[in-house]
């Protein structure tokens, strides 16, 4: 009977996910009960993350203290791996990795180089940033000067936000007790960094290059991605003021960019206002980058012979 109930449970979960995908595609509100349950699951995901050993521990015990213990052990393993890196850069790696949580807690979340060293030279640290990215430890999100396709053309290599590759590890590096605060939705913590970290992971996992936009005149957009031939601005809102987004409004009004749509991921159900679609944060995983099919094309050059 357990096999039958387990199979029935799997079918139900698939049905729920199919229904959520349908709501995402049609931009229709989710059943309120399902929405609340999905938000609960999302908050749990912010704590547990996706590291296999951590997920396994949670499934076995449901004990968040055990989850935290394993996460902190993984963080220590990262430090040991860093120690094996060549001695010239080990210190830089240590510093950068240690600073990620506090840098993300800053208002604009950008990695401030001067926090590493008052006499900072990007060229001196560049290999360390590359190592953290290539090792799958960190996710850089680069600033672009213009929200125009191709985004790569206006990318700044030395202006970026640096997220961790696992949101659960990020949560574990903050103060003790944060896990309960997340579950209880307490107001005195900065959920913005954790929400944005989860968003960066999902976007990267679905094949998107990670960028954000910032200008003194218009303000900052949390993420900009290339989607279906256009630039798609994404705002990640962890609080109640999810309809307040001055930078997004400025960019959408700018006729130079001709951006057709923007998405705001928040705690609320689906709604649409003009060009902006408000979506529950747990739906960010439904954004998928287009896969290019094989396209074979050849030119007959025989006439040139």
Task: State the predicted function of each range.
Residues 238-279:
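Catalytic cores of nucleic-acid endonucleases
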Residues 21-74:
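Amphipathic alpha-helical "lid/sensor" segments that cap RecA-like P-loop NTPase cores
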Residues 1-12:
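Single conserved hydrophobic/aromatic residue that forms the stacking wall/gate
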Residues 230-232, 261:
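Structural motif
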Residues 268-305:
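Domain-level recognition of nuclease-like catalytic cores that cleave nucleotide substrates
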Residues 212, 233-236:
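Short catalytic-loop micro-motif centered on adjacent basic/acidic residues
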Residues 51, 56-228:
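Accessory nucleic acid-recognition modules appended to NTPase machines
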Residues 10-36, 296-304:
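Charged, glycine/proline-rich intrinsically disordered loops and linkers
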């Amino acid at each position: 009977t357990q096999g039958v109930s387990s199979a029935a449970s799997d079918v139900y979960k698939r049905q729920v996910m199919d229904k959520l995908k349908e709501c995402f595609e049609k931009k229709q509100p989710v059943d309120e009960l399902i929405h609340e349950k999905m938000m609960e699951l999302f908050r749990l995901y912010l704590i547990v993350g996706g590291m296999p050993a951590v997920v396994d521990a949670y499934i076995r015990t449901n004990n968040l203290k055990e989850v935290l213990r394993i996460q902190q052990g993984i963080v220590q393993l990262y430090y040991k791996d860093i120690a094996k890196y060549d001695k010239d850069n080990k210190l830089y790696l240590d510093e950068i990795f240690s600073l990620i949580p506090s840098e993300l807690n800053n208002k604009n979340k950008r990695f401030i180089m001067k926090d590493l060293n008052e006499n900072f030279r990007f060229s001196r640290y560049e290999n360390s940033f590359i190592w953290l990215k290539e090792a799958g430890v960190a996710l850089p999100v680069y600033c672009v000067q213009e929200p125009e396709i191709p985004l790569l053309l206006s990318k700044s290599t030395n202006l970026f936000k640096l997220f961790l590759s696992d949101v659960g590890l990020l949560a574990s590096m903050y103060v003790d007790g944060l896990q309960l605060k997340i579950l209880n939705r307490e107001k005195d913590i900065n959920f913005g960094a954790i929400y944005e970290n989860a968003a960066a992971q999902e976007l990267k996992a679905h094949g998107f290059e990670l960028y954000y936009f910032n200008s003194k005149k218009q303000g900052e957009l949390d993420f900009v991605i290339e989607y279906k031939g256009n630039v798609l601005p994404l705002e990640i809102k962890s609080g109640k003021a999810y309809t307040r987004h001055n930078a997004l409004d400025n960019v959408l009004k700018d006729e130079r960019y001709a951006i057709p749509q923007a998405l705001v991921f928040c705690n609320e159900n689906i709604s649409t206002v003009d060009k902006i679609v408000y979506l529950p944060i747990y739906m960010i995983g439904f954004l998928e980058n287009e896969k290019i099919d094989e396209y074979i094309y050849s030119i007959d050059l025989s006439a040139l012979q």
